[in-house]
């Protein structure tokens, strides 16, 4: 499979020499197609060359222009920055610098440009979690109108928006596309397929718990499996039943805002997000654009029984079933720990880790066999006792091209050309083999991924399945993602230290979100900052009033640990493939 992963030195050198001339060049395009794409595309060679010729022609007015774009540092964006950006420059004559910085820094730069009006970057790869922010502030170019109007002459005829599997996540309530997906990855369940199929393990589990060891459908089963494996000896070493992280830092925030509460069953039914209450516990009534509160006393669910249950289970499992030291790990430390090979399962695992988890044993990965085939699989996330059919069941990250209105039109056009180049049908299949962050349906179904699927632990099967729509990013109920997201890690981080109980922490979190939203309401009423779609908080009422109403917030269950339920992984995949 090396042919899918290798970026050749010859290609880099060829493009480097051509880019110094900074002129549009079909010769450079052919070199790129020969050496880098090398037939790995959903398009025929003739169609690839036609796309490249279109880019050359469309870029002519901007030849020699220098533009800057920015994204977070993940494998997909490293490939864009190091390989695709130089290729684009060589082919079009537009000099593009693609900066790689931390995810939080991307948001900070974006906020700086939104607040100052100065053009910091010509385009951003920004999480679609900010769709509610962008739709309300109206400071980003709405791409639907852009493609039909000012940007029509630089919009790729073969872009095919309907081919993007995440375009619903980047569409506002007004039906307009605000961001163009560049990479996306889901948060799924990860487990040791080999251990789950071991006959002594299966027999011992069945004898103890009364049902089959398999992929947990429910959190009850996940907890039983975590308990079962923790302390068990496999291949001469002690193993653990769970992996997670708990360090009080910003990465702990998205551990929860990335739909952990909805996995437990917090919020209402609705795809891609619950209505009227979403997974953050923020209520926004149907047919309106004004959030009315996060606290149960205002009709929200951020501190309701389902949310508190979700935080309590995170804390308990981290203490009882994870390897020593996991509670002090941050997001970035948890992956290397998993590759040691002493953990049975992880309930909250990003598919962006796939590229690292299929590395060979020689690179320190103890979760593959000697041939490099994964000993693990990924599967749908289990759900908690408050979950109901029709609710989202997990999170999907969609990093998307975002162009602000404060960027001058000519620079926006040049940046739009680059954005389309790196997601084009010519390029996307090869890019997806490098980063494994699918954005196009045509790519997911390409024959090269059918061939590679056995080496990817279930990634291809998941993205080809109809279930993928139940994993979605943060939605439009969240009026200002940067302002509200930072509250989460600061409050929940105090649970694992023992400073606050889960209920106390979520009460504080919900109250602080309401305080911040009340300030947004004042700004919107005074100066139309959110276009009239800022919060309009409900008056507080007795919590029992809201808990007795249908839907979220949901009243506390008498039994939060019903009998566990599992499913056989191979049968699950077979259902997907029918």
Explain the meaning of each model-derived region.
Residues 1-22:
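Gram-negative bacterial Sec-dependent N-terminal signal peptides
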Residues 128-140, 144-148, 164-211, 223, ...:
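Periplasmic solute-binding protein
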Residues 52-58, 75-95, 190, 194, ...:
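Short, polar/charged alpha-helical segment
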Residues 52-53, 66, 373-383, 395, ...:
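Long, aromatic- and glycine/proline-rich binding clefts that accommodate carbohydrate-like moieties
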Residues 171, 319-325, 333, 342-346, ...:
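Extracytoplasmic/periplasmic substrate-recognition and gating elements
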Residues 26-61, 128-188, 281-283, 375-381, ...:
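Hinge/lid segment of periplasmic solute-binding proteins
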Residues 86-163, 198-200, 204-206, 344-345, ...:
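Extracytoplasmic "Venus flytrap"/periplasmic binding protein-like
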Residues 221-227, 265-328, 372, 381:
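Glycine-centered hinge/linker elements that transmit conformational signals in sensory
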């Amino acid at each position: 499979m090396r042919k899918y992963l290798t970026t050749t030195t010859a290609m880099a050198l060829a493009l480097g020499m051509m880019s110094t001339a900074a002129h549009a060049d079909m010769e450079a395009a052919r070199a790129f197609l020969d050496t880098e794409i090398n037939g790995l595309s959903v398009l025929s060679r003739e169609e690839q060359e036609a796309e490249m010729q279109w880019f050359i022609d469309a870029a002519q007015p901007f030849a020699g222009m220098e533009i800057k774009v920015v994204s977070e540092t993940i494998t997909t964006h490293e490939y864009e920055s190091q390989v695709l950006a130089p290729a684009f420059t060589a082919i079009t004559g537009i000099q593009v610098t693609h900066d790689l910085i931390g995810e939080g820094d991307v948001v900070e730069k974006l906020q700086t440009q939104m607040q100052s009006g100065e053009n910091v970057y010509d385009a951003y790869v920004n999480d679609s979690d900010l769709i509610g922010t962008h739709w309300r502030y109206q400071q980003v170019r709405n791409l639907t109108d852009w493609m039909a109007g000012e940007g029509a002459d630089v919009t790729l005829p073969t872009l095919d928006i309907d081919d993007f599997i995440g375009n619903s996540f980047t569409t506002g309530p007004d039906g307009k596309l605000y961001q163009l997906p560049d990479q996306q990855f889901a948060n799924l369940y990860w487990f040791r397929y080999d251990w789950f199929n071991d006959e002594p393990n299966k027999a011992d589990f069945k004898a103890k718990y009364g049902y089959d060891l398999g992929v947990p459908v429910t959190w009850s089963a996940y907890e039983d499996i975590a308990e079962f494996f923790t302390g068990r000896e496999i291949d001469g070493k002690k193993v653990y039943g769970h992996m997670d992280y708990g360090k009080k830092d910003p990465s702990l925030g998205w551990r929860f805002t990335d739909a952990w509460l909805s996995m437990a069953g917090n919020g209402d039914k609705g795809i891609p997000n619950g209505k009227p209450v979403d997974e953050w516990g923020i209520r926004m009534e149907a047919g309106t654009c004004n959030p009315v509160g996060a606290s149960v006393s205002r009709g929200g669910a951020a501190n309701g029984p389902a949310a508190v249950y979700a935080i309590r289970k995170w804390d308990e499992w981290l203490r009882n079933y994870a390897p020593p030291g996991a509670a002090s790990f941050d997001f970035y430390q948890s992956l290397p720990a998993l590759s040691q090979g002493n953990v049975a399962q992880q309930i909250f695992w990003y598919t962006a880790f796939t590229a690292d988890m299929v590395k060979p044993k020689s690179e320190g990965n103890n979760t593959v066999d000697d041939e490099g085939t994964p000993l693990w699989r990924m599967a749908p996330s289990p759900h908690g006792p408050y979950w109901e059919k029709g609710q989202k069941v997990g999170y999907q990250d969609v990093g998307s091209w975002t162009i602000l209105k404060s960027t001058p039109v000519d620079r926006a056009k040049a940046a739009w050309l680059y954005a389309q180049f790196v997601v084009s049908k010519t390029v996307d299949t090869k890019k997806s083999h490098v980063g494994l962050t699918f954005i196009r349906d045509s790519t997911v179904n390409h024959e090269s991924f059918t061939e590679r699927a056995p080496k990817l632990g279930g990634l291809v099967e998941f993205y080809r399945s109809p279930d993928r729509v139940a994993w979605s990013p943060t939605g439009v109920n969240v009026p200002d993602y940067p302002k509200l997201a930072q509250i989460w890690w600061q409050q929940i981080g105090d649970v694992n230290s023992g400073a606050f109980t889960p209920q106390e922490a979520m009460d504080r979190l919900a109250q602080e979100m309401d305080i911040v939203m009340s300030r947004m309401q004042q700004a919107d009423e005074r100066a139309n900052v959110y276009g009239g779609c800022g919060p309009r908080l409900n008056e507080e009422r007795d919590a029992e009033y809201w808990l007795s109403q249908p839907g979220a917030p949901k009243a506390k269950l008498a039994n939060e640990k019903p009998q566990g339920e599992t499913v056989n992984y191979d049968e699950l995949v077979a259902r997907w493939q029918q």
